[in-house]
Amino acid sequence: MPENTIPEITSALSQLGKPPQLRNVGTPSTVELQEHATLLAAATSDNTRRAYRSAIQHFLAWGGALPADEPAIIHYLLAHAAALNPRTLALRLTALSQWHVHQGFPDPASLPTVRKTLTGISRVHGKPKKKAKALPVEDLERIIVALEQFDTVKAKRDSALLQIGFFGGFRRSEVASLEVEFIKWQAEGIAITLPRSKTDQEGEGIVKAIPYGDDVCCPATALRTWLAAAGITSGPIFRRVDKWGKIGADALHESSVNTILAECARRAQLDYVPELSSHSLRRGMATSAHRAGADFRDIKRQGGWRHDGTVQGYIEEASQFEENAAGSLLRRNSNNK
């Protein structure tokens, strides 16, 4: 190397200064720990966290202690095997497992003997899952006609809520949390943007379009009527209305959707009110849309379902008497005449 280049290199190195002081990567700061805890919590939905919290409280109220061991969890399962649905026990077992994992303890809930115990309980005590009855669009129309007899703000709210929930294929948590800012009024109807949903936990946003109706039901018109009557221009759309007609400022609790549907169904004199729940609106949209000739893909998109199997189950329910092997046999003679 030429001697005259050495001073240049020395000068360049001196200009680099001292290397930055690096913190030990294995010791996160308090702020980072808090941020990490927030991100971990955000990875689980609010409903799931509430369910897990309830499960842990049930285990502790029974007499369990945390951290738990294998015999205690098996004892807990056996104590509730006959009284609780196996699906409920499975959820509580998952909650116990998650608690131990996140607290840094060995997870006894995932041990083979515990899982086999739950499998045995499911086989001995398992029962078919109770499903909400689908609300046919014809019965929704009966409800809307019954509500039109009451010129009250509550009736207007209920009409808008049930129509938006049905034709939008919304979950009860989604329809209860809708805000005016989510609505875009267009010439063909309304477009509703959900900033987050059960199948969109990352918040990419889902848009559901509901066209104007030309018969008994018109969700967009019902919504506009309710908003005008309530004087709502921003914030939560569906709010509490007391017996004097006073409108609250906060959004309805999602459980209120069940109550509203049941009350309105009784007014319409439907004879299967005990079989209804908020999920009846989503199921009803899917089954009624299939009967009306809607495409599978369109039904799936409107309901925001992630899995084809869920939608296929609703379609099979809607056509159980149409595409029926027994029906073909029973009608064979009339078809030959």
Spans of model-derived segments:
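Hotspots on structured nucleic-acid-binding interfaces, especially in canonical RNA/DNA-binding domains
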Residues: 45-62
